[in-house]
Amino acid sequence: MREVRSGESSARSEIDVDKDSAMPKYVIEREIPGAGKLSSQELKGISQKSCGVLSKMGPQIQWLHSYVTGDKIYCVYIAPNEHMVREHARQGGFPANRVSEVASVIDPTTAE
């Protein structure tokens, strides 16, 4: 990160994040039979457990969000390395069947 000095373009934010210095983003595939049928209370409990482990591990690893499907949960994390993502899963007792580093993010604006 670098601070934008006075006199630089006012269209820029106060802090400009250099793409090369950003931490990697990971997608974690967790095989959990019946995940799509978990109650809101069960999902809350899983989320609380994850957040508890994250608070012990420190600010370098962050959970962004998760997608719950029929038998899997796909979680998106920011972390310095895959080992830290797998350590979070180990400490929380969560499966981490596949951990993939995100190479790029595209959306409809990519086509413009």
Regions found by a protein language model. Name each.
Residues E14-S55, Q62, D107-E112:
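Short S/T/G/P-rich N-terminal loop/turn motif that feeds into the first structured element of a domain
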Residues P59-H65, R98:
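A short linear hydrophobic-aromatic micro-motif
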Residues W63-Y74, V85:
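Amphipathic, hydrophobic secondary-structure cores in small proteins
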Residues I78-V105:
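An amphipathic, aromatic/His-enriched active-site/gating alpha helix that lines ligand/cofactor pockets
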